[in-house]
């Protein structure tokens, strides 16, 4: 199956407020629909502030990726100023596996 990268560039300069407002809904969606995600994370600027998203998908077509993205809360709530999906060929993989905490098991303090 082909690999695709979704790249979403946030609206500068104050996207963090919107990201924070939608983050719980975003994480819930990703956790419920993550079977095709191979890697994901936030892009950060030179100051360490989140400024976008990159998600690597293992899906049959670019149309399937866009269908997933269009239902994703950051996309639906307008976090991104610009988005793209590109087919990607993995040539080297040295990522260390990191688990993403399930927000349903986190306590708020």
Placement of each model-derived feature along the sequence:
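Conserved, structured core segments of small domains
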Residues: 1-109
């Amino acid at each position: 199956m082909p690999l695709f990268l979704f790249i979403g560039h946030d609206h500068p300069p104050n996207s963090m407020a919107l990201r924070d407002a939608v983050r719980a809904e975003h994480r819930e969606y990703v956790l419920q629909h993550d079977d095709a995600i191979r890697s994901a994370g936030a892009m950060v600027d030179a100051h360490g502030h989140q400024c976008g998203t990159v998600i690597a998908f293992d899906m049959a077509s670019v149309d399937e990726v866009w269908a997933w993205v269009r239902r994703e809360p950051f996309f639906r709530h307008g976090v991104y100023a610009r988005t793209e999906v590109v087919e990607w060929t993995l040539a080297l993989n040295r990522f260390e596996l990191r688990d993403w905490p399930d927000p349903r098991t986190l306590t708020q303090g």
